[in-house]
Regions:
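Short, well-ordered, aromatic-rich surface patches in folded extracellular/luminal domains
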Residues: 29-30, 40, 44-82, 86, ...
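Second-shell loop/turn segments in exported
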Residues: 117-124, 181
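A low-complexity, Ser/Thr/Gly/Pro-enriched, surface-exposed linker/loop concept
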Residues: 102-103, 112, 122-135, 139-140
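Short, flexible N-terminal segments of the mature chain
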Residues: 86-107
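C-terminal motif of bacterial Sec signal peptides marking the signal peptidase cleavage site
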Residues: 23-27
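Acidic/histidine-rich, surface-exposed loop or edge segments in extracytoplasmic proteins
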Residues: 101, 106-120, 175
Length: 291
């Protein structure tokens, strides 16, 4: 199957156009004539009473996780030449949860320093949208295990990662430097085509996501003088139960305790606690994510 679209991933500002996946339903007919067949009348035919409800026929489709914290489809860029703190902040380009919510990375404001919190939008994709997305994945051959050739002539690029859970299986597709400086062919072209179609046909006009928890990484800063813009130093709230010294890798923090603080902060807002200054990397906790 050949490539359908050309797509060059943008890591921080994915081009996700407004729109929605549309499910096409085909119908099949029977061309065989029944004119020559004898008509048989069944004896004592039973006709259901008027108040009997005919059984509902469930349309066939893909089985998938249905929990609010379970992931059906995820598209992300991982790795590449990024500092650990910057990599920690990154969220998937697209994520669909089992209950039909669609999460996308929204536009990022082009200022420095940027906001502390990533811009994640959420909308309702629904079951029809999930089925259409899984059908698109099947069309591109992604409901099976695949290995992808690696182009080592490109340095420090990210992996394009697509994870799909359907029909009791979970598939991870990982391709290095997908779509960068080359015309993709074969399986790489199919993966590229799926990413392009999914991210262009799913809407990004959702509402700002309000998480129950943020995932936080705190890095001590010994010298605050080496930045192009002078950092803002803020005292960490005394009433907070979080010890920043314990957040060197990752800690989940209830959102309602830090919402206002994080919303007003940028990436050069540093926090002090117990005479130590910390720089925070923060992302909202999405379905399937955690420390």
């Amino acid at each position: 199957m050949g490539m359908r679209r050309t797509f060059t991933p943008q890591r921080l500002v994915p081009a996700i156009a407004a729109g929605a996946l549309v499910v096409g339903l085909g119908a099949c007919g029977d061309d065989n004539s029944t004119a020559d067949r004898p008509t048989v009348t069944a004896p004592n035919e039973t006709i259901p009473p008027p108040d009997t409800v005919a059984p509902t026929t469930v349309a066939p489709g893909f089985e998938h996780p249905t929990g609010a914290d379970e992931v059906v489809v995820e598209i992300a860029y991982e790795g590449g030449f990024l500092p650990a703190d910057a990599a920690f902040r990154e969220t998937p380009v697209l994520l669909v949860s089992g209950d039909g919510r669609l999460f996308v990375s929204g536009p990022q404001i082009a200022i420095y320093p940027g906001p502390l919190l990533p811009n994640v939008l959420v909308s309702d994709l629904g079951e029809d949208g999930i089925q259409a997305l899984l059908d698109l994945a099947a069309e591109h051959g992604l409901l099976t295990e695949r290995e992808y050739d690696r182009d080592d002539l490109i340095a420090d690029a990210a992996d394009t990662v697509v994870r799909i859970s359907a029909n009791g299986e979970t598939y991870e597709h990982r391709a290095y430097a997908l779509g960068l400086d080359t015309d993709e062919t074969g399986d790489r072209a199919e993966l590229q085509g799926f990413v392009a179609a999914a991210t262009s046909e799913l809407a990004m006009d959702g509402a700002a996501f309000q998480p129950e928890h943020y995932l936080v990484r705190a890095t001590p800063v010994d010298d605050t003088s080496g930045f192009d813009v002078e950092p803002t130093i803020v005292e960490w709230p005394a009433e907070s139960a979080l010890l920043l010294a314990d957040a060197g890798d990752c800690v989940a923090v209830p959102a309602d305790s830090v919402d206002e603080l994080f919303a007003e902060a940028n990436q050069l807002t540093f926090f002090t606690q117990d005479d130590v200054t910390y720089q925070l990397s923060v992302r909202p906790q999405l379905p399937g994510d955690g420390c």
